[in-house]
Amino acid sequence: MKKKLLAAALALGSATVPALAQSGLQIYGSVDAGVDYISNAGGSHMTAVNTGRRSPDRFGFRGLEDLGGDLAAFFRLENGFSLDTGAQTSPTAYFNRYSLVGLQSRGLGSVSLGHMPDFMYEYMAPLSNAVPGLSASFNPGNLDNLANQFQFDNAVKVETAEFAGFQAGAMYGMGEVANHGTANDRRALGAQYNNGPLRVGAAYSLIHGRTVDVRGLFGVTSLFGQNIAPGAMFNASRYRSQGLGASYAIGRFTPHVLVTDVSIGNAVGRTSEHNLMAGVNIDPLGDHLNVIGISGGRSTFGDRTFNQVNLFASHLLSKRTQVYVGLNHQRAKGDGTTAGLFGYARSSDDSQTVFRVGFQNTF
């Protein structure tokens, strides 16, 4: 039972939902609420009730039908919303996180079609500083998509079954633009090994045609010939992200490290964000009911540098409910660069700290 509770604690902030073992319908989700103290949000400190910072508020449906032999059909529909307002996180898509259908062979693998995230989220996010932790522990701007803000539309995904802990996959999102070659298409590859104490993952994504809020995220007002007004986006004709990470459990301690790299550009030029995340997850009492996460990160975007420290502690009240506290601090370097933890309004200077107390329930 204790091992199940520990697994649940980690899964509360992870990317995946356990697969159904037999025919049936699963309704699942997560709701999270807490109080944040923000040291500087646009020039002033503030206290606010925010939701979905431990893990996104969401609910979904997952179904599996046994077709006989080794074959099964499955589907997954998942919606993201804001608990404090009830609003959808996406104004244009109801099932914005997952909307897919597919066939699977338990011995070989699966084929999925629809709307779904890439392997940067599914294989890399479990190795990030945000698991266990808060969304503010992700890299500045989430350009590497560890937080699943961007999904592939019109996608076909092929993924192997798990063989002795190893699994791999490939995705292609069709641009559906006549006579325009690769316009708006998306491609991804991923591989992971998860067996015993060792977990290793690698992922790669290439997107032709994506907008990026470089002004809102980093304060950039002009990039490669594009003047970026407040609220306007940079139009990246090529957007590449890749990551490599690992974790290893040693008794009560699980150190982890993750490196990601993102390149965005157009016909004029390219710029990159380089990210390093490292930390250790601790089961301090050996009772599998408490988790502590200590981590740090360093990110560079052009001539801007962001250094970050993250502290997190949670206690499981049951298999589905936990209470937690978290502290995130970021310091920015670079001419005129301001700090901005992921998911919060930017600071007016080079430093920002967020302290949060909250609780989460999954179903």
Predicted regions and their residues:
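Sec/Tat signal peptide C-region and signal peptidase I cleavage site
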Residues: T16-A21
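Outer membrane beta-barrel
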Residues: Q22-Y37, T47-G175, A183-D185, Q192-A202
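Residue-level detector of the transmembrane beta-barrel scaffold of outer-membrane proteins
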Residues: Q26-Y28, A72-F74, S110-S112, Q167-G169, ...
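Transmembrane beta-strands of outer-membrane beta-barrel pores
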Residues: A33-S39, N79-L83, P117-F119, Y172-E176, ...
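Outer-membrane beta-barrel proteins
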Residues: I38-G42, D84-Q88, E122-A125, A168, ...
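Detector for outer-membrane/organellar transmembrane beta-barrel domains
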Residues: L189-H315, N361
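Outer-membrane beta-barrel "beta-signal"
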Residues: D350-F363
